[in-house]
C-alpha cells in the first residue's frame, strides 16, 4: 500500500477531526484545534516527474521550496514565486493556502502556476484534477477550488507546477528610507500606488525599525541600475544586492509564535490606510504590497493579550472598502497547519463541503471568536 493509499485509509477510518501538518514552518490559524489529531505530510516528498523541455514538474506535496529550487536550478529553471514563509515550507502548503508572493517573477500568483493536483478528499477518495502539461484543462476548476481552500476540502498530496527559465539576473535591491515622517511617506506612497516604480516593490518595516523599500530585478542587469537610481530618491541603497532565495526580510522568518493580519484597500485609499497601519502597530512587522493593495502585519506573541483590540484596529483600517482578511496565528510547538476559514455560508459552499468532506474532519477550526470567524477568508 502506497503512502497516499495509507493516508486515504486513515481519513476514511478516522472518527476524530484531523489537522493537516506540513513542514512545520507555516503559520496555522486560529486555534485552539478542538481534539484535532495531526495528519503529517512531510513524508510525502520528492520529484514524481520532471520534463525540463516542457517547463513542467510534478512533486509530492511534502517537497520543500528549497528542494524544488535545487532540482530546477540544475536545468536553469525556477518556480516563479517567493511566497511568505521560509525555503523549508512545503509545496502543499503553498498551494493549499494560495500563499501570497508579493515579489513574484512576472507578477504570477499560485493559481497561475498550478497545473494539476492529486487530492485525498474528506471521504478518503483519491482524486486528480488538471494535468501535467500546460495545455491540459481537464478538471481545471477543481484545481482552482483546492488552491487556497486551506485543506478544508481535501488533502493535497501531489502538485504539478509550471516553471520558468531562470533569468540571468534575479536579485533584490533594498533602500532604507532617510526620513520616516508623515511627509516622507506622503511623498513615497502615491508613487508606489501609482506604480511609477520601474519594477515590483514592497514597503517593509521591522518592529520599531526604519521603513525600507524592496525591489526585485529579474532579467536585464541594466534594470538593477535603474531601480537603484529610483530608490536613491527615497533613501540609502544597500551596496549589496540580495539574491531572492536569501531574502531575510519581508518574505521570510515570520516568528513561530505570532499573530498575522492581512487587510486590503483600494489604491485611492492607500496613502491614509498604510500610514494609519504603520502608526497603529509600532511593535509589529509591517509589509505593504502596492501591486495588490495589501497590508500585512505580523505581531509578536505578547500581542495575543491585545488580540481583539488589534483585530478591531485592522477592521477600522479596512473599513474604507470592507476587504478584511485576518489570519490569526497560533503555533503549536513549532508544528503548523492551515489558516482559519469561515464556516460555509452559501448553498454552493455548503454543497461543495458536503460533497468532499461530509463529516467535516479536515482542518476543522475551533472558533476563537465570532468576529474572527465572521471575517476570516478562504
Residue ranges and their predicted role:
Residues 1-20, 41-87, 99-132, 167-177, ...:
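N-terminal glycine-rich flavin-associated loop
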Residues 12, 19-21, 26-32:
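N-terminal low-complexity or amphipathic/hydrophobic leaders
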Residues 19-20, 200-207, 285-290:
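Short beta-strand
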Residues 28-45, 71-73, 94:
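Glycine-rich loop at the start of a catalytic domain that most often binds anionic cofactors/ligands
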Residues 32-35, 42, 235-378:
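Conserved glycine-rich FAD pyrophosphate-binding loop
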Residues 66-68, 180-187, 221-229, 269-276, ...:
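Short, conserved charged micro-motifs
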Residues 96, 115-257:
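C-terminal substrate-binding/cap subdomain adjacent to the FAD-binding core in PCMH-type
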Amino acid at each position: 500500500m502506497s503512502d497516499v493509499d495509507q493516508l486515504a485509509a486513515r481519513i476514511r477510518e478516522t472518527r476524530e477531526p484531523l489537522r493537516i501538518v506540513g513542514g512545520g514552518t507555516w503559520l496555522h490559524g486560529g486555534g485552539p484545534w478542538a481534539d484535532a489529531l495531526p495528519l503529517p505530510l512531510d513524508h510525502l516528498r520528492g520529484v514524481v516527474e520532471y520534463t525540463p523541455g516542457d517547463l513542467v514538474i510534478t512533486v509530492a506535496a511534502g517537497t520543500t521550496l528549497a528542494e524544488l529550487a535545487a532540482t530546477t536550478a540544475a536545468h536553469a529553471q525556477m518556480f516563479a514565486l517567493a511566497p511568505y514563509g521560509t525555503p523549508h515550507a512545503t509545496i502543499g502548503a503553498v498551494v493549499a493556502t494560495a500563499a501570497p508572493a508579493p515579489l513574484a517573477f512576472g507578477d504570477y500568483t499560485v493559481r497561475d502556476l498550478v497545473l494539476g493536483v492529486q487530492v485525498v478528499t474528506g471521504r478518503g477518495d483519491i482524486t486528480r484534477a488538471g494535468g501535467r502539461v500546460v495545455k491540459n484543462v481537464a478538471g481545471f476548476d477543481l484545481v482552482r477550488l483546492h488552491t487556497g481552500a486551506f485543506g478544508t476540502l481535501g488533502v493535497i498530496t501531489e502538485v504539478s507546477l509550471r516553471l520558468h527559465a531562470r533569468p540571468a539576473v534575479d536579485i533584490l535591491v533594498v533602500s532604507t528610507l532617510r526620513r520616516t515622517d508623515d511627509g516622507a511617506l506622503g511623498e513615497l506612497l502615491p508613487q508606489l500606488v501609482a506604480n511609477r516604480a520601474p519594477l515590483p516593490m514592497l514597503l517593509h518595516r521591522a518592529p520599531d525599525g526604519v521603513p525600507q523599500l524592496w525591489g526585485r530585478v529579474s532579467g536585464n542587469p541594466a534594470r538593477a541600475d535603474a531601480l537603484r537610481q529610483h530608490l536613491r530618491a527615497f533613501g540609502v541603497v544597500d551596496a549589496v544586492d540580495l539574491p531572492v532565495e536569501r531574502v531575510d526580510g519581508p518574505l521570510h522568518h515570520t516568528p513561530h509564535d505570532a499573530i498575522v493580519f492581512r487587510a486590503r484597500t483600494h489604491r485611492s485609499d492607500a496613502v491614509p490606510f498604510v500610514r494609519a497601519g504603520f502608526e497603529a502597530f509600532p511593535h509589529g512587522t509591517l509589509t505593504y504590497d502596492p501591486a495588490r493593495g495589501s497590508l500585512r502585519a505580523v505581531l509578536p506573541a505578547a500581542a495575543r493579550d491585545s488580540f481583539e483590540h488589534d483585530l478591531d484596529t485592522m477592521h477600522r483600517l479596512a473599513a474604507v472598502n470592507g476587504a478584511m482578511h485576518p489570519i490569526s496565528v497560533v503555533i503549536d510547538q513549532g508544528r503548523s497547519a492551515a489558516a482559519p476559514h469561515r464556516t460555509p455560508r452559501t448553498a454552493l459552499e455548503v454543497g461543495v463541503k458536503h460533497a468532499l468532506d461530509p463529516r467535516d474532519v479536515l482542518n476543522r477550526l475551533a472558533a476563537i471568536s465570532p468576529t474572527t470567524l465572521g471575517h476570516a477568508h478562504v
